C-alpha cells in the first residue's frame, strides 16, 4: 500500500486495518473496525453498522478514523445526515511538479501529513493543545 492511500479516509474495509497488521493493532477504534468487517463479511450488516456508529461516537480519534467509518457506512447503504455530510474533516492537496507530485494533508484533529516528490515525508501529530494558540 502506498502511504498516500492512507490520507483520504476511503480505503476498502479489508485494508483498514490491513489483514497482515491485525495482530499489531489493538484497542479502539481498531477493534470496532475489525468487528464491523467480520460482521459485514458474515452478512450481518446491522451489527457492522452498529460498530461503525460506535466509532463515530468515540471522542478524540484521528479524523481519518471518522472518514473511514463513514466510507464503510456508505458501502453498507447508509448516507450521513445532511449536516454531517458537510462536515470537513480534512483537506488533501496534490501539487504536480516537473520532478513528481507533492502531497499535503491537514486534518481537523490538528494532524498533518506531507509527502515530497522525492519520497521523503513528514507525519505531524498533535499530542496536546500547546500549539493551538
Q: What are these model-derived regions, one by one?
A:
Residues 3-6, 11-17, 24-26, 31, ...:
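N-terminal domain-start interaction segment
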Residues 120-132:
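Long, charged/polar, surface-exposed segments that mediate recognition or autoinhibition
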Amino acid at each position: 500500500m502506498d502511504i498516500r492511500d492512507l490520507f483520504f479516509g476511503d480505503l476498502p474495509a479489508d485494508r483498514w486495518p490491513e489483514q497482515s497488521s491485525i495482530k499489531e493493532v489493538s484497542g479502539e477504534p481498531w477493534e470496532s473496525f475489525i468487528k464491523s468487517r467480520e460482521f459485514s463479511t458474515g452478512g450481518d450488516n446491522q451489527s457492522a453498522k452498529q460498530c461503525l456508529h460506535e466509532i463515530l461516537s468515540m471522542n478524540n480519534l484521528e479524523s481519518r478514523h471518522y472518514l473511514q467509518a463513514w466510507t464503510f457506512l456508505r458501502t453498507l447503504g447508509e448516507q450521513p445526515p445532511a449536516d454531517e455530510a458537510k462536515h470537513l474533516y480534512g483537506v488533501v492537496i496534490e501539487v504536480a511538479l516537473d520532478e513528481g507530485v507533492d502531497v499535503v494533508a491537514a486534518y481537523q484533529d490538528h494532524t498533518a501529513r506531507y509527502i515530497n516528490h522525492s519520497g521523503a515525508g513528514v507525519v505531524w501529530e498533535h499530542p496536546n493543545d500547546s500549539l493551538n494558540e
